[in-house]
């Protein structure tokens, strides 16, 4: 398959026929080549547009709202620049969505994210993950108690915005209860990429774009729709994409991943397979067993997959880790398993301990509590990192360790060894692996 065949398909668009005095608006759906493939009446919601595109277009096609006859449901302004949507799906221009209040759905306050950033350079190349990152939203409904994101400037320095957009008083304490979407990201990304003249590609980042590092890109249908559009735009330009999600809903875009033919790798965070234990500190996340099943489906379809075995718990024995890695090998044959023990620093660790205790996971809470002692934490990290590396070699599972910088500092006679692990330029992945031109 040639590269030109890979990027087959572009933007579909909607054309509106002005209604008569007693008629609803009528729309025709055009392919990139100009063929009409469907007609319907009535102004569509954003969900209808995105889902119609997913269900009827070719995998690497999508309806682009900036190129379509879509008008603000409130003021009737044509949508040709920034836009958002209400919880019910009404498409609004940016002026109108900015004045629209957030709304609660399933216990999560939802609204529009005013962030101007589209794609950002990322320091995660130090973990061999990417050079760029795209976040489809601010906030996350999963509410993992150990999550580092609410302790980053992206949340801490935007408290006024969070208060204004979602009535959030404390971005960290309320993590999991707010979600601000970037609905127009696929449209803005397409135009950003068309203007972009340089592309960073370090040895450890490989020029990869990660979706997402600050939220879960498949946590619900709306986030998934944004993600699909972004993946399509990146793959059409032959840019490698790394998906990281805890949601089994990722399988909904298997058609796109297969059509990408080597430019997409899909991974999930699976620290262990004891659903109740994981649920205690990842209260809004799908069960790890469901994540495993989703990755198995994707792997069986021939799409590259990886696992983030992070963060592993102090309750996990060497045999637990062996069984987990054996399961990954047998079910997934992953390109790599990234591994990282839990980090006891920051206010989120206190929340993690409390959540485990409140969920009745007393042993987990007690073992986590012990990690406040630096020597205990160093010993636990040393044991788990060493065990996972040895077990990976024993089971023929490719491993890439993520030792914490502070751990390396106190690793004693193993400091040089773990520092080399920390500074490795490449993970064992054979990725990206684009198709060979014929």
Task: Please annotate each region the language model reported.
Residues 2-6, 19-20, 102-109, 319-438:
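Auxiliary Fe-S-binding modules of radical SAM enzymes
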Residues 214-216, 246-248, 269-273, 310-314, ...:
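Active-site beta-loop-alpha junctions enriched in small/polar residues
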Residues 242, 248, 313-324:
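Active-site glycine- and acidic-residue-rich loops that bind
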């Amino acid at each position: 398959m040639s590269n030109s065949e890979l990027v087959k398909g572009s933007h579909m668009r909607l054309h509106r026929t002005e209604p008569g005095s007693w008629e609803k608006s009528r729309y025709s759906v055009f392919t990139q080549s100009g063929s009409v493939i469907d007609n319907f009446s009535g102004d569509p919601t954003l969900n209808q547009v995105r889902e119609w595109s997913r269900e009827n277009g070719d995998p690497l096609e999508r309806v682009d709202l900036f190129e379509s006859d879509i008008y603000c449901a409130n003021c009737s302004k044509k949508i040709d620049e920034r836009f958002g949507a209400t919880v019910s799906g009404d498409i609004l221009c940016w002026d109108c969505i900015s004045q629209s209040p957030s709304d609660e759905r399933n216990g999560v306050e939802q609204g529009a994210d005013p962030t101007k950033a589209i794609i950002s350079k990322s320091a995660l190349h130090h973990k061999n993950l990417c050079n760029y990152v795209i976040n489809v939203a601010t906030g996350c409904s999963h509410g993992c108690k150990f999550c580092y994101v609410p302790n980053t400037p992206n949340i801490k320095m935007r408290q006024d915005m969070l208060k204004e957009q979602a009535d959030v008083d404390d971005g960290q304490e309320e993590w999991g209860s707010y979600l601000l979407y970037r609905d127009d990201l696929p449209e803005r990304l397409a135009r950003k990429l068309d203007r972009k003249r340089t592309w960073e590609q370090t040895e450890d980042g490989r020029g990869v774009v990660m979706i997402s590092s600050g939220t879960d890109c498949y946590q619900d249908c709306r986030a998934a729709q944004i993600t699909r559009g972004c993946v399509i735009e990146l793959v059409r330009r032959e840019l490698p994409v790394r998906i990281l999600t805890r949601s089994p809903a990722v399988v909904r875009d298997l058609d796109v991943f297969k059509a990408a033919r080597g430019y997409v790798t899909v991974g999930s965070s699976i620290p262990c397979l004891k659903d109740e234990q994981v649920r205690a500190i990842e209260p809004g996340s799908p069960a790890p067993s469901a994540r495993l099943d989703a990755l198995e489906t994707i792997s069986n379809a021939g799409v590259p997959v990886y696992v983030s075995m992070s963060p592993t718990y102090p309750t996990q024995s060497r045999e637990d880790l062996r069984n987990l890695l054996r399961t990954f090998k047998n079910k997934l044959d992953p390109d790599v398993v990234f591994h990282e023990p839990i980090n006891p620093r920051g206010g989120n660790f206190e929340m993690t301990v409390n959540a485990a205790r409140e969920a009745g996971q007393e042993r987990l809470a007690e073992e986590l509590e012990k990690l406040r002692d630096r020597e205990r934490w160093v010993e636990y990290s040393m044991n788990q990192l060493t065990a996972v590396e040895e077990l990976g070699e024993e089971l023929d599972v490719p491993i890439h360790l993520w030792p914490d910088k502070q751990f390396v500092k106190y690793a004693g006679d193993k400091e040089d060894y773990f520092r080399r692990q920390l500074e490795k330029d490449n993970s064992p992945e054979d990725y990206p692996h684009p198709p060979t031109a014929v």
